[in-house]
């Protein structure tokens, strides 16, 4: 299947924040770009400027001053199909430079994705892009595959949504899946807010990107939040400086760990919800008593919002406190977890045993979009 690039399968992981796309069998995605579509706010004044009616990804990001930006994927679920089509078109033709009608395509979906959504994805792939075959896989399951496991519980936290997904022998257990609408975007917003309290002003979408960069470079998770706050108050050992694009240097202290602490204490941003350690525990407790031991011993972190230094140690500490005292608890935090969904897709689509799993164009023509529920589960 993968001996030549002519028929190699494509793998496209559509996240709320970033699209990750590339070829099955590769060890990393070729294209990673923001999941945004921008449209000009005003009609172009200058004739012949070749102004397009829409821009996708990095180009939309760089022209954001004159555009209205929209994210077609909210909280992991596709909500705007016209814009989503534009993103897929951009992925195939501009980023990967392939003809989709020549490549089987593996797409990813959020856990508990509505049935109508899976059908719509299937329909667009076959009818708009004429793919020869396609498959839809649950993101968390792919992350687990990427870590070399088939049983475990995945904490997948990206830009738009966080899920706890217990998986047994390769199958997600839907009754025990937890969803938390708190993820990277909310943490960036929270960091903007607490930096404003320090006297720095960040308001525009352009400034938000700067804050996201500060977050990614300087934030970390404290092992003991109260202790860390005390240390930050009594000395400057935790302070770091960051140079803004205009050359101004700002200093940030306790904000570095107050920002991601929100994952463990959602009340920081006014959310009445359990933290990620409690949702993990609750998810395990909804599973059959016989498999809990396997889940506790295989806690896999996945997604960009699990990239904070210190998060694995903190999860270990918090879950140990909740679980039975004799239980062996292990947190697995692979270094490439930012892309582990994509990597899992790349592994899956290049397995010889997977080749019979594809939904083919012929099967689609015979059965229609609902075929996806029979073949992808």
Curated annotation (Swiss-Prot):
Subcellular location: Cytoplasm, Cytoskeleton
Pfam hit, one: Actin
Primary location recorded for the protein, binned into one broad class: cytoplasm
CDD domains: ASKHA_NBD_actin
GO molecular function, one term: ATP binding
Keyword Manganese on entry: no
EC number, as in UniProt: 3.6.4.-
One cellular component term from this protein's GO annotations in UniProt: cytoplasm
Reactions performed catalytically: ATP + H2O = ADP + phosphate + H(+)
Chain residues in the propeptide: 1-2
Protein role: Actins are highly conserved proteins that are involved in various types of cell motility.
Assembly, per entry: Polymerization of globular actin (G-actin) leads to a structural filament (F-actin) in the form of a two-stranded helix. Each actin can bind to 4 others.
Annotated family: Belongs to the actin family.
Protein name in UniProt: Actin, alpha cardiac muscle 2
Protein's organism: Xenopus tropicalis
């Amino acid at each position: 299947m993968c001996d030549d690039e002519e028929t190699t399968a494509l793998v496209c992981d559509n996240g709320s924040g970033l699209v990750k796309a590339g070829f099955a069998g590769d060890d990393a995605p070729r294209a990673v770009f923001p999941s945004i579509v921008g449209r000009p706010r005003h009609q172009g004044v200058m004739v012949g400027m070749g102004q397009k009616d829409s821009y996708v990804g990095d180009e939309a990001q760089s022209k954001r001053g004159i555009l209205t930006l929209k994210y077609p994927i909210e909280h992991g679920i596709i909500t705007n199909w016209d814009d989503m089509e534009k993103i897929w078109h951009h992925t195939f033709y501009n980023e990967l430079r392939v003809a989709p009608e020549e490549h089987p395509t593996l797409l990813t979906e959020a856990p508990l994705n509505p049935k109508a959504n899976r059908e719509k994805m299937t329909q667009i792939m076959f009818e708009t892009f004429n793919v020869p075959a396609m498959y839809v896989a649950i993101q968390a399951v792919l992350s687990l595959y990427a870590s070399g496991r088939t049983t475990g519980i995945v904490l997948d936290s990206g830009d738009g949504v966080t899920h706890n997904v217990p998986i047994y022998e390769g199958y997600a257990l839907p009754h025990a899946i937890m969803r938390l609408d708190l993820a990277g975007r909310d943490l960036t917003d929270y960091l903007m807010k607490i930096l404003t309290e320090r006297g720095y002003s960040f308001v525009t979408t352009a400034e938000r990107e700067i804050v996201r960069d500060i977050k990614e470079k300087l934030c970390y998770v404290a092992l003991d939040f109260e202790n860390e706050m005390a240390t930050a108050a009594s000395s400057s050992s935790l302070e770091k400086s960051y140079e803004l694009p205009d050359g101004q240097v700002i200093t940030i202290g306790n904000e570095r760990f107050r920002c991601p602490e929100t994952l463990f204490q959602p009340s920081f941003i006014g959310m009445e919800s359990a933290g990620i350690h409690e949702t993990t525990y609750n998810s395990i407790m909804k599973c059959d008593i016989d498999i809990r031991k396997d889940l506790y011993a295989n806690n896999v972190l996945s997604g960009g919002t699990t990239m904070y230094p210190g998060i694995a140690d903190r999860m270990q500490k918090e879950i140990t406190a909740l679980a039975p005292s004799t239980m062996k608890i292990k947190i697995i935090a692979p270094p490439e977890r930012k892309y582990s969904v994509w990597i899992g897709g790349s592994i899956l689509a290049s397995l010889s045993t997977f080749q019979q799993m594809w939904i083919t164009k012929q099967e689609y023509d015979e059965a229609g979009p609902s075929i996806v529920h029979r073949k992808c589960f």
